[in-house]
Amino acid sequence: MIFRAATADPADVDRALAYPADGPVAALTAEKVREELAGNRLRPEWTWFAEDADGEVLARALWWGRADSERPIALDCLQVRASVADPAAVAAGLLAAGHAAFGNLPDYNVSLPRGWRDEPELAAAVAWRQEAAYKAGLTREIERLRYEWTPAAGTTGPTGRLVFRDGTDEEFLDAFVRLSAGSLDLHTQTELRSMDAEQLAREDVAFYLDCPGERSWWRLAHLPDGTLAGMAIPSATPYHRNVGYLGVVPEQRGQGLIDEILGEITRFHASQGAERITATTDSVNAPMAAAFDRAGYQVTEIRLVLEAPSTR
């Protein structure tokens, strides 16, 4: 078996486009691959094949990044021909080859419909992908709900329970530190096992500054008496406006203030003409999921995230 990037021959990109987007797990179509290549979010060096001795392509892996990314951020598409007897082994070898070339282990995002475990063919296709990812070092698994808001859902007006204002970098850093305490977010919980809250806060600030959204959108949320209640960080992806980050400080939780903060983010994006606002939360984060439901956001897919454990 030969594992290689689509860089050896000008025809390699055409081969990537020609690979059928079939199978029970959703795959990128030729049109979508072409669009992402044009936007520099997919690249030949991030597109990998597994070939047999005769040069037949048996598997395809497409890693994705932002247009200015130096290395890929996530694996978006992994396919193995139905004729392959052990798809997990071939896929694991393909992922390992890509990881070695990139010098890192990007997450693998698998987009799935709700109730996917109840569909035997789909569940089996997910299972070999999980096995391959695990063998390639992506041993941590998180299931997330992907939400979407459209103008048909409408917005709610401010109630006056919170006052939103801009803040300094240090104020936002402090808010990130405070919000991490008792967080139900699995990523936050995991990272806090290997670093302190301030280090994680600095990484979170850097992450959102690097997103396509604007720093000027960020808001601190205060009670009318000036007490910090939480934070709203509207953001964006290369495709749509995004909820970004929001939260309530521990001492103010349980009073419905998350609805006020989510409402502020939604109103902001809607006022800018957003036709779609996306968001994700862990499936086990019931309070956040309930807030999205109350705000009219709809679950559009389940996102199974397979990632490498923290090495710190």
Go through each PLM region and give its residues.
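Short amphipathic alpha-helix that is part of the acyltransferase structural core
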Residues: M1-R34, P158-E198
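Active-site rim helix/loop that mediates acceptor-substrate recognition in acyltransferases
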Residues: P20-F49, T190-L223
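Conserved donor-binding loop and adjoining core beta-sheet/short helix segment
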Residues: A21-G23, R34-N104, V110-G115, P224, ...
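A structural microfeature
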Residues: A59, I142-E143, A229-G230, E301
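Conserved acetyl-CoA-binding loop-helix of GNAT-fold acetyltransferases
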Residues: A85-A101, V248, G254-S271, A286-R294
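Acyl-donor-binding surface of acyltransferase catalytic domains
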Residues: D86-G167, L306-A308
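Conserved hydrophobic beta-strand within the GNAT/NAT acetyltransferase core sheet
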Residues: Y108-S111, V243, I277-T281
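Conserved active-site tyrosine of GNAT-family acetyltransferases
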Residues: R129, A133, F292-D293, Y297
